[in-house]
């Protein structure tokens, strides 16, 4: 069968930059699906995307479908022929319906019945016939939220379509896609090479466009931007901040990237750098530069879509554009300083946190009381914790946060520093929202840890207290994410406290607002404990490890974490699988018949294997007990791993359910002692082999 290289390009007006990569990937995925559904094999497929085009190159694709046979079933052979072997009316009707003669009739076995059939040869359709509809269907299935229709077209797309290229090697495939006749003509850069570019072969696409100042390959264009940006940053001994989403967006905005470094006035560096970075990244799509200490430098890098003969004009134009935005940030910052943070509480008293739970000032006072109560646990200074809590939400009323909501907390830190607050208090204002996402950093200060914990606990307990716990996909207060934050704050700061203690402390701040304290306590504790699984699955911990620990229901997150780590370590030991299986066996035996009260009677140990196991238990128990007391669970389980050989020997050579009642009772007690030792850390019988 012949193989071909196919090129498809859809040219249009500038595509939405934030969607370009998604559209490219979806076009490739949908086309692959269409080719597979049609039975057209291919070696590889590459997708391209630039501001004015989406394209595909399909390598070594079949020139046609394989020929097939289609079976049309008729009556049973018994009903198709009479006693003399002549066709019955049933068979004649079948042949007439299929337009065939008797010599074209075949038979096949359908279970226990033999039937007649007609095997019709079906010639496979050509690539030329199939591909246009495959591509049109792929375009129709793209994830486009809002489609538009141009005046001259009956079809809809995310942007008006201008041209279509569809080549099979050096031949145009006759097709109409998106109401445009396919051809072999594409177009280069809108300004550098606006004239038509005729493609002689599908393989010429990338090279022909690069000659016309278009880099169609998204990844190549992106790599070029990264190289240029790094070079410009290196020239001023700085490092560029290159967020992945911003890099994708900038790559989607240009066909021929040319990075240029510009300056802004150094006086703006007095403004919180987070505000400057935010406005330059979000509004201007610039890459900001920082020094080795992470301090913003008075430069930015813009990526132009043209190679100018006078780049100075572009640089000066961007400097002129960014100045008003930086001036706005400076104005907000200076205006905010005219009003001390503490004086903003009156505005907080008019900002609703949640209708039933009061205002943001109500929340602040609850957090302050809770922070003081948490201070002995976190090691924070109670006075610092209380002050930080009362100031924590004040920057929400500031001009700077009003313009840049993502600066909440950060703005407060700057203002607190200016007002002379100590480091614990000022840093806590910015740290209160940490961690913001999975894997994010935690607060560095004890006061920040305290406020972050108090804020989350107050919200969680309050929302549960008014009966608005998360249900299904509804979690308007992001309590699931917040719960994992609480667990991380406790575990990673090694806070020795139970979830129940923390929830109880938070409940005290609500008084009569929460009507059923007992139910709220139980529900909130269960919710937090239920988030262990999400937390540890993110870390790659196996489900059976969690189940082994959860079987003991540890109350302290820190203790829970130590047990998980210990079981994870134990699970990797060569003895683990055999010990888990043995413990399952022990658990099953004791479930059927509980061990009698009392200790093992050494005189009733008659078999060598049971004597050896008892001796090992007597030796290992005093070695393990101090480790358990110190919560060194990893070392404890490692010690217990040495019991594998005597346990295996016991089950190989000893009948637990002996006819002699005393021997049986003694062996059950021995197993109970063993079971107890292995379930102090976790129920290892839950572990899978």
Curated annotation (Swiss-Prot):
User: In the UniProt record, which is one GO cellular component term?
Assistant: cytosol
Which superkingdom, per the lineage?
Bacteria
What PROSITE patterns does the entry give? AA_TRNA_LIGASE_II_GLYAB
Which protein family is it in?
A: Belongs to the class-II aminoacyl-tRNA synthetase family.
HAMAP family, sorted? Gly_tRNA_synth_beta
Q: Tell me how this protein assembles.
A: Tetramer of two alpha and two beta subunits.
Q: What is this protein called?
A: Glycine--tRNA ligase beta subunit
């Amino acid at each position: 069968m012949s193989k071909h290289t196919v090129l498809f390009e859809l040219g249009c007006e500038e595509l939405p930059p934030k969607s370009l990569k998604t559209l490219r990937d979806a076009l490739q995925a949908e086309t692959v699906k269409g080719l597979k559904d049609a039975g057209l094999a291919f070696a590889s497929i590459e997708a391209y995307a630039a501001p004015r085009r989406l394209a595909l190159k399909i390598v070594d694709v079949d020139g046609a479908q394989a020929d097939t046979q289609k079976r049309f079933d008729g009556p049973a052979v018994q009903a198709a022929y009479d006693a003399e072997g002549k066709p019955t009316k049933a068979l004649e009707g079948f042949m007439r319906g299929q337009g065939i003669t008797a010599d074209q009739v075949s038979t096949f076995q359908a279970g226990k019945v033999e039937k007649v059939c007609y095997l019709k040869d079906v010639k496979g359709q050509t690539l030329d016939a199939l591909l246009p509809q495959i591509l049109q269907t792929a375009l129709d299935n793209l994830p486009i939220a809002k489609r538009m229709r141009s005046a001259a077209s009956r079809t809809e797309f995310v942007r008006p379509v201008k041209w279509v290229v569809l080549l099979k090697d050096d031949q145009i495939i006759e097709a109409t896609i998106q109401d445009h006749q396919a051809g072999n003509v594409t177009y280069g850069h809108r300004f550098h090479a606006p004239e038509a570019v005729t493609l002689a072969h599908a393989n010429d696409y990338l090279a022909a466009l690069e000659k016309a100042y278009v880099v169609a390959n998204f990844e190549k264009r992106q790599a070029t931007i990264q190289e240029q940006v790094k070079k410009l940053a290196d020239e001023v001994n700085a490092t560029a901040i290159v967020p992945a989403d911003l890099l994708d967006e900038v790559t989607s905005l240009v066909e021929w990237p040319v990075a240029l470094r510009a300056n802004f006035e150094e006086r703006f560096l007095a403004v919180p750098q987070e505000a400057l970075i935010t406005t330059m990244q979000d509004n201007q799509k610039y890459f900001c530069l920082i020094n080795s200490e992470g301090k913003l430098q008075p430069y930015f890098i813009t990526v132009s879509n043209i190679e100018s003969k006078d780049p100075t004009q572009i640089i000066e134009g961007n400097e002129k554009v960014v100045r008003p935005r930086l001036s706005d940030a400076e104005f907000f910052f200076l205006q905010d300083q005219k009003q001390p943070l503490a004086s903003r509480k009156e505005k907080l008293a008019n900002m609703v946190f949640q209708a039933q739970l009061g205002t943001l000032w109500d929340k602040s006072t609850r957090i302050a009381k809770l922070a003081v109560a948490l201070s002995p646990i976190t090691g924070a200074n109670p006075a610092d914790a209380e002050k930080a809590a009362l100031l924590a939400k004040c920057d929400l009323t500031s001009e700077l946060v009003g313009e840049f909501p993502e600066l909440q907390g950060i703005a407060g830190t700057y203002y607190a520093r200016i007002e002379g607050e100590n480091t614990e208090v000022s840093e806590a204002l910015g740290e209160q929202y940490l961690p913001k996402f999975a894997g994010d950093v935690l607060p560095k200060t004890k006061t920040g840890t305290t406020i972050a914990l108090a804020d989350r606990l107050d919200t969680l307990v309050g929302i549960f207290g008014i009966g608005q716990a998360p249900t299904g996909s509804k979690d308007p207060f992001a309590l699931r994410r917040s719960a994992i934050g609480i667990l991380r704050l406790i575990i990673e700061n090694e806070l020795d406290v139970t979830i129940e203690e923390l929830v109880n402390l938070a409940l005290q701040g609500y008084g009569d607002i929460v009507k059923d304290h007992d139910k709220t306590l139980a529900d909130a504790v269960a919710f937090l404990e239920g988030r262990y699984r999400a937390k540890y699955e993110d870390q790659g911990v196996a489900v059976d490890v969690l189940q082994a620990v959860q079987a003991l229901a540890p109350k302290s997150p820190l203790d829970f974490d130590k047990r998980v780590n210990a079981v994870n370590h134990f699970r990797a030991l060569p003895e683990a699988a055999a010990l888990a299986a043995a413990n399952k066996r022990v658990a099953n035996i004791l479930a059927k018949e509980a061990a009698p009260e009392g200790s093992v009677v050494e005189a009733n140990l008659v078999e060598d294997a049971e004597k050896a196991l008892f001796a090992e238990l007597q030796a290992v128990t005093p070695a393990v007990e101090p480790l358990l007391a110190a919560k060194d669970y990893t070392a404890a389980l490692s010690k217990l791993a040495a019991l594998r050989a005597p346990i295996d020997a016991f089950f190989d050579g000893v009948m637990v359910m002996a006819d002699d009642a005393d021997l049986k009772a003694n062996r059950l007690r021995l197993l109970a002692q063993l079971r107890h030792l292995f379930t102090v850390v976790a129920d290892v019988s839950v572990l899978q082999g």
